[in-house]
From Swiss-Prot:
The keyword Isomerase applies. The lineage of its organism: Bacteria, Bacillati, Bacillota, Clostridia, Eubacteriales. InterPro entries: LacB, RpiB_LacA_LacB, RpiB_LacA_LacB_sf. The gene is lacB. Its EC number is 5.3.1.26. It is an enzyme of class 5 (isomerase). One of its GO terms (biological process) is galactose catabolic process. Gene3D superfamilies: Sugar-phosphate isomerase, RpiB/LacA/LacB (3.40.1400.10). It catalyses: aldehydo-D-galactose 6-phosphate = keto-D-tagatose 6-phosphate. GO terms for molecular function: galactose-6-phosphate isomerase activity; ribose-5-phosphate isomerase activity. Heteromultimeric protein consisting of LacA and LacB. This is Galactose-6-phosphate isomerase subunit LacB. Keywords: Isomerase, Lactose metabolism. SUPFAM superfamilies: Ribose/Galactose isomerase RpiB/AlsB (SSF89623).
Length: 173
């Protein structure tokens, strides 16, 4: 299976452990960054990882930030993505079986690496259980977003914000 991964500057170390874990299980990993602890914007990497799934280049996605909240929200802005923020294996299973989630987000600073690995295993092994009710729910979710043609696949989409950051336009932590 091809898995698209991405993270923010808070958890690149966790992302690399997850990448190695996935590879050890025989998966191909598309790493969308970030690669270091230099302050950056999580929407860049949530969007990049999600677009690989939406385009069909990857089968599923795993994204991480400190809590998983921000990066899951950014991934969910990509048409065709159903990203679920998960902190336990039961939620991972539910997200896949009933909502056909194609991306999971995990908080790398609040969830231990062993549990993250278990969550990923359950998510990858779970199978969607199509029912009329599930299909109607998913259809409704998928119809909530209309892609801005200037956004999808546009690697320069965040340039304005990055320039503002580089020029001191945002407060440093």
């Amino acid at each position: 299976m091809v898995i698209s991964i991405g993270c923010d500057h808070i958890v690149p170390d966790i992302k690399m452990k997850i990448s190695e874990y996935l590879k050890s299980k025989g998966h191909t990993v598309i790493d969308n960054g970030t690669y270091d602890f230099v302050r950056t914007h999580y929407p860049i990497f949530g969007k990049a990882a999600a677009e690989k799934v939406a385009s069909g280049e990857a089968d599923l996605g795993v994204i991480l930030c400190g809590t998983g909240v921000g990066i899951s929200n950014s991934a969910n802005k990509v048409k065709g993505i159903r990203a679920a923020l998960v902190r336990d294996v039961g939620t991972a299973r539910y997200a896949k079986e009933y909502l056909n989630a194609n991306v999971i987000a995990v908080g790398g600073r609040i969830t231990g690496i062993g549990l993250i690995e278990n969550i990923i295993d359950v998510f990858l092994e779970a199978k969607y259980k199509p029912t009329k009710e599930n299909q109607e729910i998913i259809k409704g979710i998928d119809e909530l977003i209309e892609n801005d043609k200037g956004q999808f696949g546009n690697e320069h989409f965040f340039d304005e914000f990055i320039e503002k950051w580089d020029n001191g336009g945002y407060p440093k932590e």
